[in-house]
From Swiss-Prot:
Comp. bias (Gly residues): 992-1008
Designated name of the protein: Probable ubiquitination network signaling protein acrB
Biased composition (Polar residues): 30-43, 68-83, 131-143, 580-589
Family of the protein in this entry: Belongs to the acrB family.
Residue ranges, annotated region (Disordered): 1-94, 109-143, 343-371, 580-603, 831-855, 879-905, 963-1019
Lineage: Eukaryota, Fungi, Dikarya, Ascomycota, Pezizomycotina
Transmembrane segments: 163-183, 216-236, 259-279
Length: 1019
């Protein structure tokens, strides 16, 4: 699976003595052989600074046609560092050690070469990967398949590995899963690979436990405690969940997801298992489904419809069963050891102080064993504060003083290696095992083919002809390594690769190889060809120097071919300490000397520090030289000022002489410049014929090409115009098609609108008929109700009319009685001729005679309400034919008048409307209805309701006679004015009434209002 590049940069140091393999690197195979040649000492593996990945190539087999097998002396084996045993022998070399060719690998100091026959170990033909920047590439690299190159890269990705292993474990059958758990649990009781046979009988190793694992007593106690909790407090669901948690622990341990910055893997895996168990739990399924059904969120039909979509594992129909006792014991042991490891890591993290931060990034290889070393220090009870040095080793405060530390002992390193090995992922452990086996195989094979020989020098190599190139060390200094190399062209010719014929080298002076120091491409390595030596007389064809190194440090120098990227050899050397007191004081040496090669990053850092120290030293010297130069310049300036002063202080003659000399010098220089310009002009005027011919040829070519260009431009313009015309025609067709489409769309829209309008009109017509029918039905009901109301009102009005007629008859009877009384009084007055008063007739009166008074006047009513002689007469019953004055017209009061209508026909149009005379001042105003009374309606109401309290009807005879003499008077006015209106016993709301009346003078009155209105205003 793909892995992130971030984890590849965190690869651990490949040190065999600490027991850790390259967890983030994968073995790359060469095309010639499938065997691997890997050195776990950290020096032979050359890593890149940019991609941080290493190719661990294989060695060539004996059947490889490139390597000739004629003689043992002519066979060259690529050097490789020795195992951990070789590190112990490293200090035996004074100025360094080298492991290179099986026959010849030299380390020379001051011209003396020493053979390293016992330290020689290595396969043939190794290869390192170049750095991404600044590396030399050959055309042969283009044939490398990118897929094959990508397949050789294995990056560390603990989270993906852990989840993949967990998924794989959950899919295994129960029997296979039990076997896996048994194997995993048995690993906790096995001794570490670094433990010796005597450690099995050591009480400390058994009961205290090796580094990274608890002791045996602690494991037994934790297993018993967890087993007690398992049997007493955990129910079936919890036991099954804990059983899957054991699978999670196995996956985390094998995938390496529980270490470093991958703490979130534990939570993710536990969450996945917990969610699976919660979803598959029958009780939780019943609770959730019952809650959803009771709250009507889903229906049973919907549940039965979609229930088949769920996997069969989630549709549990019966409760879970308890796991077997064997699986329970294995799960208890695995979980107990996981809890113990977490507790130990937490305690170690809390009690151990953090290493000091220098503000710079620490080498990933150097910091690989930091946590393991801290845990080892915690387990051993060491109270010395420590931190990780630049070379990846623990450096304490006492190390600066003594240079030695107890944590670097063999037992401490063994525990440290055991803990690192226990934290490696499963695939890293497999890779480490394979690498170790292949390395031992290559080492034993190389030793079997290698024969020891006597020390040799460069003079001993004269006249030797080897089939392949050879590189050896000539001198080792504190900051430089000098080397020499043989001729590589013969090797290319013998191999038949054809690299020189293809032009890979380009020239004889091109470097046939380049240098990598500790896996990093070394830019300060210089290689030059030896030209003075005759060919064939000496083996030295190339000499080089590796500069920029730090003193007292171990380096692994790899020499790689430029054309094939194949390693020629790998030599491990150690630079001596610097004896210069001044440089020692300026350059800070490592706090603890390292006898193994550092990582590329550490190597570059040390080189940078050394270069900076030298630069600072040169700067100080330059600063000192600048100060000295400033002093010298100041002295010279003083002398120059003195000479100038002496010159200016001279006489005028000397000054004029110097001026004339200066002018002569200027004239001579000007003449020389003029002559030179004249010569150039002469040369320019005479143009050579050859140049003129060339110019004419070039001009003809230019004109020809210009003509071709113009014709091409014309063709291009014509083609463009034709294409433009075609495009314009196509655009016109497109626009017309778009217009037709728009017209069709508008027509379609219009037709759709008409169709919708017709459909809506049809629907609306049906609704309109229904609405009209409903309105007609409602109107008929309202008319029926109104008709019933009018019928009731007509019945009430008819009853009221009958009551009015009865009362009118009574009033007419009273009027008849009054008329009879008046007639009797008139008769008495006629019989008595005396004056009306004792004093006689009043002035202005016209006493009437009996002859002047007609008989018909005796029957007229008096206009006044005053009674004769102050007497009031009771009402008399009149004849049924006598009627009152009608408001419609005036009629005679004589009972025998033939034109007078009967009394039962004379009633007003409205029962509450009547005309009032001038005698009643209380009824001159027209009032409103009772439903909307004004300020005067209270007066009207009181008089109207108090009609029975009016004064008795009285007549004044004199006034009656005076009115009779006045022309146009109405004989029935007094009677009409003396009548009180009769109130209606009912009120009718919402109706209108009107009335009119007339008297003898032609006056009329009208009124309008509600049925409660009783009077009309007279004009």
């Amino acid at each position: 699976m793909p892995r992130s590049s971030a984890t590849a940069r965190k690869s651990h140091s490949n040190r065999h003595e600490n027991g850790s393999a390259n967890t983030g690197k994968k073995v790359a195979k060469q095309k010639s052989n499938g065997h691997l040649n890997v050195n776990l000492n950290g020096g032979s593996a050359s890593s890149s600074l940019s991609s941080s990945q290493v190719d661990l190539p294989s060695s060539r087999s004996s059947s490889d046609p490139v390597v000739p097998t004629t003689t043992a002396a002519s066979t060259k084996l690529n050097g490789t560092p020795d195992s951990s045993k070789g590190d112990c022998n490293a200090p035996d070399h004074l100025n360094g050690y080298a492991k290179g060719n099986a026959d010849m690998s030299y380390v020379q100091n001051d011209g003396v070469a020493s053979q390293t026959g016992g330290d020689v170990a290595g396969p043939a033909s190794r290869r390192t990967e170049k750095s991404a920047t600044g590396s030399k590439r050959s055309p042969s690299n283009a044939s490398v398949n990118p897929l094959q190159l990508a397949s050789t890269i294995l990056k560390s990705c603990p989270m993906y590995d852990t989840i993949a292993i967990l998924i794989f474990l959950l899919q295994l059958p129960p029997m296979v899963l039990t076997l896996v758990q048994f194997l995993f649990a048995s690993l906790t009781f096995l001794p570490p690979s670094g433990a010796s046979a005597g450690s099995l009988t050591s009480n400390f190793d058994i009961f205290q436990g090796p580094a990274g694992t608890p002791s045996l007593g602690t494991m037994i106690a934790m297993d018993g405690f967890c087993l007690l909790i398992w049997g007493l407090f955990m129910w079936t669901w919890a036991q099954n969940f804990a059983l899957d948690l054991a699978h999670v622990q196995v996956a985390i341990t094998l995938g390496g997801g529980g270490f470093g910055k991958n703490g979130g893997v534990n939570t993710l895996c536990v969450g996945i298992v917990l969610i699976m168990h919660l979803v598959r739990s029958k009780g939780i399924q019943d609770f959730v489904i019952g809650h959803l059904l009771s709250s009507n969120i889903i229906s049973p039909d919907m549940l039965s419809q979609y229930s088949h979509l769920l996997p069969t594992e989630f549709r549990r129909t019966e409760p879970q069963t308890s796991p077997s006792w064997l699986r329970s014991l294995l799960a208890v042991h695995i979980l107990a050891q996981a809890g113990t490891a977490m507790a130990r890591r937490s305690m170690a993290k809390n009690r151990t102080p953090n290493p000091p931060r220098t503000g710079k990034r620490i080498d990933t290889e150097a910091s690989a064993g930091s946590q393991t070393q801290i845990d080892s220090a915690f387990e051993s009870g060491a109270s010395v504060s420590s931190y990780i040095g630049a070379d990846g080793q623990i450096v304490t405060s006492a190390a600066h003083k003594d240079g030695r530390d107890r944590l670097l002992s063999a037992k401490k390193r063994r525990r440290q290696a055991n803990q690192v090995r226990s934290r490696q992922p499963f695939w890293a452990a497999l890779a480490s095992t394979k690498i170790t086996v292949m390395r031992e195989y290559e080492h034993s094979r190389a030793l079997s083919k290698t024969a020891r020989s006597l020390p040799m020098t460069e003079d001993d190599l004269q006249g030797l002809s080897l089939d392949d190139g050879l590189v050896w060390i000539t001198e080792i200094d504190s900051s430089t390594i000098k080397f020499a190399a043989g001729d590589f062209s013969s090797a290319d010719d013998s191999s038949g690769s054809g690299a020189c014929e293809a032009g890979c080298l380009g020239s004889e002076d091109m470097e046939p190889f380049y240098v990598c120091v500790n896996g990093a491409l070394w830019a300060t390595a210089t290689i030059c060809k030896v030209h003075d030596a005759p060919k064939g007389s000496s083996m030295v064809h190339w000499r080089g120097e590796i500069s920029g190194l730090a003193p007292n440090c171990a380096y692994t120098c790899s020499f790689v071919r430029s054309d094939t990227d194949e390693e020629i050899c790998v030599i491990s050397v150690k630079t001596p300490a610097n004896n210069d007191a001044e440089q020692v004081s300026s350059v800070s040496t490592p706090p603890h000397p390292s006898y193994r090669p550092s990582s590329p990053t550490t190597t570059l850092k040390n080189s940078i520090v050394n270069a900076e120290a030298k630069l600072n030293e040169k700067r100080s010297r330059l600063r000192k030289a600048k100060n000295d130069h400033k002093l010298i310049i100041s002295k010279i300036r003083k002398e120059l000022d003195n000479y100038n002063h002496r010159l200016h202080s001279g006489t005028d003659e000397n000054r004029q002489k110097q001026r004339s000399l200066q002018l002569e010098r200027n004239i001579r220089q000007t003449e020389e410049a003029t002559a030179l310009l004249e010569d150039q002009l002469d040369n320019l005027e005479n143009v050579p014929e050859e140049e003129l011919r060339k110019w004419s040829d070039q001009k003809a070519k230019y004109e020809h090409e210009l003509g071709l260009l113009n014709s091409a431009k014309e063709e291009l313009a014509s083609a463009r115009s034709a294409i433009a015309r075609e495009v314009s025609s196509l655009e016109t067709e497109l626009s017309s098609a778009i217009q037709r489409r728009e017209r069709l769309q508008s027509r379609r829209t219009r037709i759709n609108e008409q169709y919708e309008r017709i459909v809506s009109a049809n629907a609306q017509g049906l609704n309109e008929r229904e609405r009209r029918a409903a309105e007609q039905f409602a109107r008929e009901q309202d008319q029926a109700k109104l008709e019933a109301t009018f019928n009731e009102q007509f019945a009430t009005i008819g009853q009221s009319v009958q009551e009015y007629q009865l009362r009118a008859q009574q009033i007419w009877q009273q009027c008849d009685a009054i008329e009879q009384a008046i007639q009797q009084q008139h008769q008495q007055m006629l019989l008595d001729p005396g004056p009306l008063t004792p004093e006689g007739n009043l002035p202005g009166t016209n006493p009437f005679s009996e002859s002047a008074l007609p008989l018909g006047a005796l029957t007229s009513t008096a206009p006044s309400s005053r009674s004769l002689l102050g007497l009031s007469f009771p009402p008399l019953k009149s004849s049924p034919l006598q009627t009152a004055s009608s408001p419609v017209g005036a009629s005679s009061s004589h009972p025998t008048s033939p034109v007078q209508q009967p009394s039962y026909l004379n009633f007003p149009t409205s029962p509450l409307v009547n005309a009032s005379s001038h005698l009643d001042s209380d009824f001159v105003y027209r009032h409103r209805s009772f439903s909307n009374r004004s300020a005067r309606s209270s007066l009207y109401g009181s008089d109207f309701m108090d009609s029975s309290r009016r004064q008795p009807f009285q007549l004044d005879l004199s006034e009656l006679l005076a009115d009779k003499r006045s022309p146009g008077s109405d004989s029935n006015t007094a009677l009409n004015s003396g009548l009180r209106p009769v109130s209606s016993p009912f009120q009718r709301a919402g109706s209108r009434g009107s009335g009119s009346g007339s008297n003898g003078s032609g006056g009329s009155g009208s009124g309008s209002g509600s049925p409660s209105s009783v009077y009309g205003k007279t004009n």
